[in-house]
């Protein structure tokens, strides 16, 4: 019996080995050339010697990796581009290594050189003016940019998604053939440093069209043609100056900055109207914007977005009026729906449903029905209540357990365990361990380690290091440095400087100035003025006025936010006075409605 058991065990092991071998062979590509191209890799590239996936658990050999992410372009197969790149690297690395003294000094000086280059570029100065000591070293280290530039394409932290082709300005240098094979882009003045743009966060990006001069080539999403002036060629869908131009201009090119112009004017001087509709009664007040309907008196013809008709000509300054009134004095209603029971409370706004008592008819956005008339002032109520006194719930979903004090839940999902104090959960997902104190989870994903105190995770992704205190990660991406305290990263992209405290970056794009404290930028666009404190801009568009305090604008369109056009002479004062009059009337109307409510 014993030899038979050993033979059966040997047969099972043989079958297991054969099955594993067949399964491993099924994952390999049939085309060997396709496997050698280095595709199907994430995070870092495979080596040429081992181009396939490794199923066994072991680390990669210490070979040179490019760490490209979502790489598009050349493969591992050598071609003429590789030979040209090798020639460029040999010519650039020989003087570079003669100047190097030690590995430590090289790493420190490289940060200083990169910082000096960025400061000179942002301040539009020469490198010798910013840092005279590092000018010669930067010229010797231009080969590093060529080497690092080859690792871009959809890479968080440096340049990526580069498209386009070089212009005629780049063809004046002697090594054009080598440079065109390694760098594809459009440079300004032959500078190889700015040759890496196009879809690049941190400098110029999304460039379309052609330029007339090398200086104003920083156009973004340019459409149409200019008025034969190179300085005016920066408009068309450009954040910071003119954009979205419609209509035709006057013979003077100075008034060509109109945006979204419609209709016709009465006087040629006031032809800068934007989004004008309807007709005016007096030529002086023809600067209305978005005017609808007609007026009763010519003095109040400055109405904007007027609907319906009025009872008295004095109160004809209504905006967005719907329905009809009961008394002429309360005709200043805005967005009125439904009907009222009492004339005094006819200033309701956005009323739905019906009331039980005329005194509580001032409800706004009421849904459902009430049990008691005194609590009929509910807003956006859903479902039914248990007690009339608790009927003031807002946006209630689900049902309660039966206790009166826990019936004030808002946006409740799921079911409770049975205790009244835990029934106040909001937006609960998943299941609990069966204890009452951990049933208050909100938007929980993933699984816990089995202990009750770590079951309160919210939106957890990834895996923990095995300790209970780090299992509370929220929306974690990427990998940690191996320490427990830095494993709580949220939405981390790119790479860190090597220190634990800067590894907690969130959605970082672009590049830093070389200091660790400015490496925590979030969604940075555009370029800074060269100072460290203004490098933390978020979603910046356009350019500043030259002062550092205005360079921290967020979602800036022009100087003001959503600015269309500019005033001419004293027209802005007349517009401002008319707007102030309308604002005062609107405020008085709102205050009257609020007091009566």
From Swiss-Prot:
Residues annotated with Phenylalanine amide modification? 72, 156, 163, 201, 208, 223, 239, 246, 262, 277, 292, 307, 322, 337, 352, 367, 382, 397, 413, 429, 445, 461, 477, 493, 509, 525, 541, 557, 564
Which parts of this protein are propeptide? 1-68, 75-150, 166-195, 212-217, 226-233, 249-257, 265-271, 280-286, 295-301, 310-316, 325-331, 340-346, 355-361, 370-376, 385-391, 400-407, 416-423, 432-439, 448-455, 464-471, 480-487, 496-503, 512-519, 528-535, 544-551, 567-597
Where do the record's region annotations for Disordered lie? Answer: 98-141, 569-597
Its chief place of residence is secreted
**Cell compartment(s), UniProt:** Secreted
Record-level GO BP terms: neuropeptide signaling pathway
Q: So what family is this one in?
A: Belongs to the FARP (FMRFamide related peptide) family.
Tell me what this protein is called.
FMRF-amide neuropeptides
Tell me the classification of the organism that encodes this protein. Eukaryota, Metazoa, Spiralia, Lophotrochozoa, Mollusca
């Amino acid at each position: 019996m014993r030899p038979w058991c050993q033979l059966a065990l040997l047969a099972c092991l043989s079958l297991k080995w054969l099955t594993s071998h067949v399964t491993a062979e099924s994952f390999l590509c049939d085309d060997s050339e396709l496997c050698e191209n280095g595709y199907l890799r994430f995070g870092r590239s495979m080596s040429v010697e081992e181009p396939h996936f490794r199923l066994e658990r072991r680390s990669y050999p210490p070979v040179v990796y490019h760490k490209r992410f979502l790489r598009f372009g050349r493969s591992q197969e050598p071609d003429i581009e590789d030979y040209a790149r090798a020639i460029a690297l040999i010519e650039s690395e020989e003087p570079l290594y003669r100047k190097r003294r030690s590995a430590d000094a090289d790493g420190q000086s490289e940060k200083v050189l990169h910082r000096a280059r960025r400061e000179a570029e942002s301040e539009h100065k020469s490198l010798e003016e910013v840092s005279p000591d590092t000018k010669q070293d930067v010229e010797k280290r231009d080969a590093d940019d060529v080497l690092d530039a080859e690792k871009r394409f959809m890479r968080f932290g440096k340049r990526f998604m580069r498209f386009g082709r070089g212009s005629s300005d780049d063809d004046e240098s002697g090594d054009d053939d080598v440079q065109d094979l390694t760098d594809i882009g459009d440079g300004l003045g032959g500078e190889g440093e700015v040759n890496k743009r196009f879809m690049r966060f941190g400098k110029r990006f999304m460039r379309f069209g052609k330029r007339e001069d090398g200086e104003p080539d920083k156009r973004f999403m340019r459409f149409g043609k200019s008025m034969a002036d190179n300085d005016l060629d920066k408009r068309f869908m450009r954040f910071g100056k003119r954009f979205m131009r419609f209509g035709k201009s006057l013979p003077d090119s100075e008034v060509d900055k109109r945006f979204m112009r419609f209709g016709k004017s009465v006087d040629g001087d006031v032809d800068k109207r934007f989004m004008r509709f309807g007709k005016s009664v007096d030529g002086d007040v023809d600067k209305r914007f978005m005017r609808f309907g007609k007026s009763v008196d010519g003095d109040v013809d400055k109405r904007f977005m007027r609907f319906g008709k009025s009872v008295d000509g004095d109160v004809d300054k209504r905006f967005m009026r719907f329905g009809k009134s009961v008394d002429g004095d309360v005709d200043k209603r805005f967005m009125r729906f439904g009907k009222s029971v009492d004339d005094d409370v006819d200033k309701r706004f956005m009323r739905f449903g019906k009331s039980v008592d005329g005194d509580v008819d001032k409800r706004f956005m009421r849904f459902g029905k009430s049990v008691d008339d005194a609590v009929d002032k509910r807003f956006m109520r859903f479902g039914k209540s248990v007690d009339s006194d608790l009927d003031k719930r807002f946006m209630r979903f689900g049902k309660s357990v039966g206790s009166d004090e826990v019936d004030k839940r808002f946006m409740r999902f799921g079911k409770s365990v049975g205790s009244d104090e835990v029934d106040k959960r909001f937006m609960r997902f998943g299941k609990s361990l069966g204890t009452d104190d951990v049933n208050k989870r909100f938007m929980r994903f993933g699984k816990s380690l089995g202990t009750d105190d770590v079951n309160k995770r919210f939106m957890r992704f990834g895996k923990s290091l095995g300790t209970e205190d780090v299992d509370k990660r929220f929306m974690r991406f990427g990998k940690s440095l191996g320490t427990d305290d830095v494993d709580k990263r949220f939405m981390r992209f790119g790479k860190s400087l090597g220190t634990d405290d800067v590894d907690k970056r969130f959605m970082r794009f672009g590049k830093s100035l070389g200091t660790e404290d400015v490496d925590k930028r979030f969604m940075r666009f555009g370029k800074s003025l060269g100072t460290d404190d203004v490098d933390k801009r978020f979603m910046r568009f356009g350019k500043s006025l030259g002062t550092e305090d205005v360079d921290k604008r967020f979602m800036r369109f022009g100087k003001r936010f959503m600015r269309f056009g500019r005033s001419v002479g004293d027209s802005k004062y007349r517009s401002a006075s008319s707007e102030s009059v309308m604002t005062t009337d609107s405020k008085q109307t709102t205050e009257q409605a609020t007091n009566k409510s």
